[in-house]
Amino acid sequence: MELKGSKTEKNLLVAFAGEAQARTKYTYYASKAKKEGYNQIADIFEETANNEKEHAKIWFKLLHDGIQSTPENLKDAAAGENYEWTDMYFNFAKEAKEEGFDKIAYLFEEVGKIEKEHEERYLKVLENLENGTIFEKNGEVYWHCQNCGHIHKGKVAPKVCPVCDHPQSYFQVRAENYK
């Protein structure tokens, strides 16, 4: 049987969208409950949001034949962000302006700019992955272990953190945008 074009495929799409939206909504509700001093209720919303995320993952994997490799996921993510900034938000802003919703049009335009940055970031990370420069740079940089905070100076991130024994995957180039 072919899933593509079937009623079941449409149902999976609706189920995925519904679960993904519920997850996001429940995280907003959790934040509000926490701000209002209801930590137990916030925890219930967070737990349910995590359940909804897992439900969405089931439907996503069925729709996409699993979850692809990181390079494929980066390409897919970049394509989605490209659509959002070149088409979706551009047209949404235009329509909002035509209808007199200038503030909403402005927000669509500004979010579109952010989506463009997202696309560029995904493409740059993909380029780094393809060039083998995720954990190796041309010049010396500071590498930061995200687990214990160890700082290593060099062209290559350590294979294993000398402090906490976590693997190289925990290292990122240290950002110093706070100075």
Regions found by a protein language model. Name each.
Residues 1-179:
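Non-heme di-metal
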